[in-house]
Swiss-Prot record:
GO terms for cellular component: cytosol; nucleus. It comes from Schizosaccharomyces pombe (strain 972 / ATCC 24843). This is Inclusion body clearance protein IML2. InterPro entries: Iml2/TPR_39. Disulfide bonds: none annotated. Interacts with lipid droplet proteins. The keyword Nucleus applies. GO terms for biological process: cellular detoxification; cellular response to misfolded protein. PANTHER family: INCLUSION BODY CLEARANCE PROTEIN IML2, TETRATRICOPEPTIDE REPEAT PROTEIN 39 FAMILY MEMBER. It is found in: Cytoplasm; Nucleus. Inclusion body (IB) resident protein that interacts strongly with lipid droplet (LD) proteins. Involved in LD-mediated IB clearing after protein folding stress, probably by enabling access to the IBs of an LD-stored soluble sterol derivative that acts as a chaperone in inclusion clearing.
Length: 563
């Protein structure tokens, strides 16, 4: 290699080391490395840090700074890419300049995400254009090298060149897979439009692309990020859906054994990163070991907070959910209250969730003090979300507004918590599909027969939905059909979401009871389509659509295997 090539490669290695520092929550060390030079790679590292800071704070000034740094990095990368191509300069064993193309593609993706976070239609349109450019870059690289990428990683004998090869290979696979996976999760109509522009949403291929780097080079930066994204997908979208194909490798619809094996390798490579114990807790919760998950999270919470503030938010939120799911109501409430101090942008949700936990503790443990705490949290919520349009804010406004009217009809006596009908915590557990993470013992603790003094017919619908879901998760699927049929027949209710989800639950029941036969699958698909097209004033429609899309993907594959 020439002296110029060696210097470029050294700059590249320094920046990769900085990126790995980020995975260990060593932001100061990473920033120092990125500022140690002014090469296009150093500028890219600075842009990544600025992007992370912008996303975590959501401050307009940081978004602007991030965009400026990305623009500067892209300009420098483009110049170096052209120079490498012109002078046939290799850093890896792939094409001259390919490292710069991967970096440009990554910068374009980050820039597009920033644009989508803005409220400007013009900026959003520009973001679509940037996505298209990034998509084109990675498509060209894949067309030329995908067969090589999909094979085992081979060492060249030089660690720096191996690092460059690793960057190109894992970076391309991650960006390609993540881009394709996100498209596959969009609403069907939007996918149809994007297909016109050449975007394809093949979910199976996307997951394959993301698993390749995680399996080949699990400790590398892009591979670790790919693995983290996979865990987020499995713990988020996949856990929301109760229709999945069971195989020896994926007994619960996702590769649990493989995930734990890769996580162990990543944890050894990044022992100081709080992100990885958080992901261990997620996996433990997904395999119905919530007690173990809570221990991991509480060990994390006892340590000094991560330098990345958003990581602390994610850790505490996971702890709050696991406590709520495992009937530790006061612990869950306290974690939700802590979240309010860490992230004031979602105060209403955290306060409502905390109030729901306190109220459940009143019902189960006769905790009179918790009733007062619940009322105190509920009082300001209606005004707090008065002008907000996010689905959960709309749900909270409607629910609290109903309590205010009930209290007014009783002469405005007492706290709002005294006028709650069916358990709001049970409803929130359903929205997050926490029932899927529970053991039979945890499920059996849900009192789905309890009637409250202020409970009305709308509350009855929600209670029936939760009862059917608990019974199904306990394996008593035959008992849920008459319950769900009664809900599906409802034509007028303020709890539209519950009726829409009842159609989805009917599909799940058909899949579990008769999913091995074509007739059962057709009934299942029919109810999934009814759920998708239900419409109405459903605050949780986006969550329903995600479940339906994932479910129909499974059902269609089952039907294809029978034809």
């Amino acid at each position: 290699m020439s002296k110029s090539q060696e210097q470029r490669l050294q700059n590249f290695v320094t920046v990769i080391q900085g990126l790995n520092d980020i995975l260990d929550d060593k932001m100061d060390e990473a920033t120092e490395k990125f500022k140690s030079g002014n090469s296009s790679f150093h500028l890219s590292g600075q842009a990544v840090v600025a992007f992370i800071q912008a996303v975590l704070t959501f401050e307009p000034s940081r978004f602007k700074d991030s965009q400026n740094r990305i623009d500067i990095a892209i300009k420098a990368l483009s110049a170096d890419k052209d120079d490498a191509s012109k002078n046939n300069t290799f850093l890896s064993t792939f094409d001259p300049g390919v490292e710069y193309r991967v970096s440009i593609g990554l910068m374009l993706l980050l820039s597009a995400l920033i644009g989508f976070c803005s409220e400007s239609i013009v900026t959003s349109v520009k973001s679509v254009y940037k996505l298209r450019k990034a998509h084109s870059i990675f498509s060209k690289i894949n067309k030329r090298h995908f067969d090589h990428f999909s094979a085992a990683f081979h060492s060249t004998g030089r660690s720096d060149v191996d690092l460059a090869n690793e960057y190109v290979q894992t970076g391309t696979l991650l960006c390609t897979g993540l881009f394709t996976l996100l498209i596959s999760l969009l609403p069907p109509k939007m996918i149809t439009i994007l297909n016109v522009f050449g975007y394809k949403g093949d979910r199976d291929w996307a997951l394959q692309c993301m698993w390749m780097p995680a399996l080949q080079r699990p400790t590398s930066f892009f591979a670790a990020v790919a693995f983290a994204a996979l865990i987020q997908y499995y713990s988020g979208a996949v856990q929301l859906c109760s229709i999945y194909k069971k195989t020896p490798e994926e007994p619960d619809g996702w590769p649990d054994k493989r995930c734990f094996e890769i996580l162990e390798k990543v944890e050894k490579a990044h022992p100081d990163g709080p992100m990885w114990p958080l992901h261990r807790a997620k996996l433990l919760s997904m395999v119905k070991k919530q007690d173990e998950a809570i221990v991991v999270l509480e060990e994390l919470m006892a340590k000094p907070p991560p330098r990345l503030k958003q990581l602390e938010v994610l850790i505490v939120f996971e702890h709050a959910l696991d406590c709520a799911f495992s009937h530790r109501y006061v612990d869950g409430a306290n974690s939700f209250l802590k979240l309010s101090s860490l992230n004031d942008s979602s105060t209403a949700l955290y306060s409502y969730f905390a109030a729901a936990c306190f109220l459940q503790d009143v019902h189960v443990n006769a905790n009179v003090e918790a009733l007062e705490k619940a009322s105190k949290l509920l009082e300001p919520l209606h005004d707090l979300v008065a002008n907000k349009t996010a689905p959960l804010d709309v749900h909270i406004r409607r629910k609290v507004g109903k309590l205010i009217k009930r209290r007014a009809s009783a002469g405005n006596q007492g706290g709002l918590a005294e006028y709650v009908g069916f358990s709001p915590l049970y409803e929130l557990v359903y929205v997050w599909n926490g029932f899927r993470r529970m053991t039979d013992d945890e499920l059996s603790k849900f009192d789905v027969e309890r009637m409250e003094p202020w409970q009305d017919q709308d509350d009855d619908i929600c209670q029936a939905l939760i009862k059917a879901t608990v019974l199904r998760n306990l394996g008593r699927t035959d008992e849920v059909f008459p319950i769900l049929q009664k809900i599906c027949a409802v034509t007028r209710t303020t709890e539209t979401w519950a009726v829409a989800f009842a159609h989805y639950e009917m599909a799940v029941a058909f899949f579990e009871s008769n999913g091995s036969k074509k007739e059962g699958l057709k009934h299942c698909d029919a109810y999934l389509r009814k759920a998708r097209d239900f419409g109405g004033d459903n605050e949780f429609e986006s969550r329903l659509i995600i479940r339906v899309q994932l479910a129909r993907h499974v059902v269609r594959k089952c039907l294809q295997s029978m034809s």
